[in-house]
Curated annotation (Swiss-Prot):
Family: Belongs to the HisA/HisF family.
Pathway named in the protein's UniProt entry: Amino-acid biosynthesis; L-histidine biosynthesis; L-histidine from 5-phospho-alpha-D-ribose 1-diphosphate: step 5/9
Annotated protein name in UniProt: Imidazole glycerol phosphate synthase subunit HisF
Organism whose genome encodes this protein: Shigella boydii serotype 4 (strain Sb227)
UniProt subunit comment: Heterodimer of HisH and HisF.
Family matches, as PANTHER family: IMIDAZOLE GLYCEROL PHOSPHATE SYNTHASE HISHF, IMIDAZOLE GLYCEROL PHOSPHATE SYNTHASE SUBUNIT HISF/H IGP SYNTHASE SUBUNIT HISF/H
EC number: 4.3.2.10
One of the Pfam families matching this protein, by short name: His_biosynth
Any GO BP annotation: L-histidine biosynthetic process
Amino acid sequence: MLAKRIIPCLDVRDGQVVKGVQFRNHEIIGDIVPLAKRYAEEGADELVFYDITASSDGRVVDKSWVSRVAEVIDIPFCVAGGIKSLEDAAKILSFGADKISINSPALADPTLITRLADRFGVQCIVVGIDTWYDAETGKYHVNQYTGDESRTRVTQWETLDWVQEVQKRGAGEVVLNMMNQDGVRNGYDLEQLKKVREVCHVPLIASGGAGTMEHFLEAFRDADVDGALAASVFHKQIINIGELKAYLATQGVEIRIC
């Protein structure tokens, strides 16, 4: 059985790490490289960096900090932000990233997923999905351009359909960003995760809602996700990664202990 992964998420804007609530009202957390180094030393299995305004600004992720991160950490890391072409992806991978993640550009042109997977291999192609639960309809819908509140829009895709579509096109991993839960720290949306797990046959990463160690346990035990991504609880030092992993191990979760 593969070990479950604990993945700190660093949202990047204007060269700094920021964090919002439900993708809004972002506050500055700190500098990118020192935070990355800290999380690697604490025992993170992987890091994810989202340049949150790259797609909505029509630019690619700022490459200068990617190479700096690669120099100071020895764990895999994934970079997302405005990657719209094979050339964009090649540059970011050449600067030291292990994976690239696409979100809004994949919605704009789903063939991008296949082209990237064919060129670089499915193992390094992640598709991020920003999903919002509509209480009126009882359905989950995919959102686009979520890094800019003024441009965020609901797409025609229902989340479960898009999860299946991206797999057909070559996604090697899916990160499910549950927008309703983002930053509120009251737990992952387990019901949604279970539904997605049923149709997701590649590694599935839960994102949005972690507030306690128990929330991570629930995601692994009840929804059988492969990894749990979180930001606020790590940035604000509410949860220490080493202590979290020790707790999960005592609960019978297969986890890499540093």
